[in-house]
Amino acid sequence: MAAQGFLLIATFLLVLMVLARPLGSGLARLINDIPLPGTTGVERVLFSALGVSDREMNWKQYLSAILGLNMLGLAVLFFMLLGQHYLPLNPQQLPGLSWDLALNTAVSFVTNTNWQSYSGETTLSYFSQMAGLTVQNFLSAASGIAVIFAFIRAFTRQSMSTLGNAWVDLLRITLWVLVPVALLIALFFIQQGALQNFLPYQAVNTVEGAKQLLPMGPVASQEAIKMLGTNGGGFFNANSSHPFENPTTLTNFVQMLAIFLIPTALCFAFGEVAGDRRQGRMLLWAMSVIFVICVGVVMWAEVQGNPHLLALGADSSINMEGKESRFGVLVSSLFAVVTTAASCGAVIAMHDSFTALGGMVPMWLMQIGEVVFGGVGSGLYGMMLFVLLAVFIAGLMIGRTPEYLGKKIDVREMKLTALAILVTPTLVLMGAALAMMTDAGRSAMLNPGPHGFSEVLYAVSSAANNNGSAFAGLSANSPFWNCLLAFCMFVGRFGVIIPVMAIAGSLVSKKSQPASSGTLPTHGPLFVGLLIGTVLLVGALTFIPALALGPVAEYLS
């Protein structure tokens, strides 16, 4: 089984790199403000019709545009969910959501989290799914990519005050990247058997003679951008383990590729725009090393399973609880690491049913900020924050002013970097503490002891880091949990974007210094090791005490 696991990981990464390389070249053109071939005329007409000016923006203007678009989307989606019973395409006559669930859901999809305190097939109409959630899947993904575009430009421009035009970037990202690729993926899903219709739910007789109501809906179109944009919110409650969303092993493989496609392509694009492709490869090496180790640990833990099962008469100790038999242990383990390394959160297995160590790895991947490939845009700017921190630490060790890509990293940048890195750990630890201190928080726990605490810690980690997956043994649809998680999602998203944009505004105004004999090379294996060590050190120092009370205690008990 070890050979099968190695072959699965190697095949996945090989296909991923082959697909991401050409996409990275296209993204590099957009970062350099070069229209893609054949799009200039269309862009001119659209910009004119929409009244979009291509005048460049400073970091505050760029940030204001991103925040303004997202706040408008939040308000529209909130009221849409409240009043969905007045809107069309609701064949099941589903009522509007409560204010707290509508707020939680609106914040969730605007922040690219897609945490779901509801069951899609029994709560949301087709209109809410399409015009509400799917639209935000596109816009939240485009927002994250636009932020990393601006951040990359900060390193490649010199003595300037502008970072590009947010509206131009958002339109180009949506029209020329997200929509075409999502369309291709959706058509493939439909061909493989995913649903795409507007029919009422269908009553059928099962082979046992019982009656069953089968949910319908425009699934494939939402499923495609759900994976491509690292959104993760399922059309159905079972998410990607549902055969109507993920009908075959081939669609499952494509879903995993779609999750990592844009984050990987952005690393290639960064290397091209920086004029040194080794810089992009360095980031990919660091991400890939952590990723492969984490996949190996989860596969090992799930294959070892629970030895007590053998004593109880089971044929095998392999942990198949909560997993689709059509996917198996190895694929389920790979998917779990992919979806939590990125900020996706889609699942084909119930993470709550993983072994203690198997469930701890996905939780830890979220807690370190989802910088191992990560979300579209957010993963790369999160990892680049750790790059700045690693450069700063190296500068302290050799007694030189830290610099990266020729830009000196001063006190202002390091303060903002520290702020951005500490936002999500603060939310996670304080949120989990608040939940455990209050009756409203503890009453949602369905399991006692360390596993119950793990469910709470996982939920807050998922929300604060904009992942959206869950240990399902937590009854989170209550005013307390909906409001707590909405706050964590909102601050976890925009509380990081704001200092990232401020860092970009500071760096873009600096001159690029030529490399000297004392310059730390940031493209070799030594720096890859330093970067991995920085990520692991921050994660260990921050979360080991909390993890010791949850999954570690469960493993040892």
From Swiss-Prot:
Protein topology in the membrane: Multi-pass membrane protein
Keyword annotations: Cell inner membrane, Cell membrane, Ion transport, Membrane, Potassium, Potassium transport, Transmembrane, Transmembrane helix, Transport
MF GO annotations: P-type potassium transmembrane transporter activity; potassium ion binding
Record's subcellular location: Cell inner membrane
Transmembrane residue ranges: 5-25, 63-83, 132-152, 170-190, 253-273, 283-303, 329-349, 356-376, 379-399, 416-436, 484-504, 526-546
Cellular component GO terms, alphabetical: plasma membrane
Main location: membrane
Classification via Pfam families: KdpA
Complex formation: The system is composed of three essential subunits: KdpA, KdpB and KdpC.
Function: Part of the high-affinity ATP-driven potassium transport (or Kdp) system, which catalyzes the hydrolysis of ATP coupled with the electrogenic transport of potassium into the cytoplasm. This subunit binds the periplasmic potassium ions and delivers the ions to the membrane domain of KdpB through an intramembrane tunnel.
NCBIfam families: kdpA
Entry similarity comment: Belongs to the KdpA family.
PANTHER family associated with the record: POTASSIUM-TRANSPORTING ATPASE A CHAIN, POTASSIUM-TRANSPORTING ATPASE POTASSIUM-BINDING SUBUNIT
HAMAP family assigned: KdpA (MF_00275)
The protein's name: Potassium-transporting ATPase potassium-binding subunit
Origin species: Escherichia coli (strain SMS-3-5 / SECEC)
Name of the gene this protein is made from: kdpA
